[in-house]
Amino acid sequence: MTRRGCWPHRIIFSLILLTWTHVTLAALIRSHTFSNWPKPPCKMYYPIDPDYEANCPDVIALVCATNGLNYKNECFFCIDRWEFGPHIEFVKYGKCE
């Protein structure tokens, strides 16, 4: 019996292992700074009708604003900004410190 039959399995295993290692190390080494992210696209969340009740998604992606509040996500931040005025400004994604 020859050992040629196991070569495809070794090659596939090696390729999967190398890919997994590369992706894992890249994720660990790369810095995750939120300061490079763009500001929330608030125009997308502004209601067309003044009587419209906002229906923001139930997703937790914290947004910090200049009023010191942590908003659950950018939709809640944008709706608050629309209701209370442009003096509420975006600071960063993530929790306020």
From Swiss-Prot:
It comes from Rattus norvegicus (Rat). Keywords: Disulfide bond, Protease inhibitor, Secreted, Serine protease inhibitor, Signal. Residues 36-97 form the Kazal-like domain. SMART domains: KAZAL. Restricted to the epididymis, with highest levels in the initial segment, including epithelial cells, lumen, and sperm (at protein level). Localizes to the sperm heads, where it is restricted to the acrosomal region in epididymal spermatozoa, but not in testicular spermatozoa (at protein level). PANTHER family: SERINE PROTEASE INHIBITOR, SERINE PROTEASE INHIBITOR KAZAL-TYPE 13. Pfam families: Kazal_1 (PF00050). The gene is Spink13. Residues 1-26 form the signal peptide. The keyword Kinase does not apply. It is found in: Secreted. CDD domains: KAZAL_FS. It comes from the Eukaryota. Induction: Up-regulated by testosterone. Gene3D superfamilies: 3.30.60.30. This is Serine protease inhibitor Kazal-type 13. The keyword Nucleus does not apply. Coiled coil: none annotated. One of its GO terms (biological process) is negative regulation of acrosome reaction. May be a serine protease inhibitor. Essential for sperm maturation and fertility. Inhibits sperm acrosome reaction, protecting sperm from premature reaction. GO terms for cellular component: extracellular region.
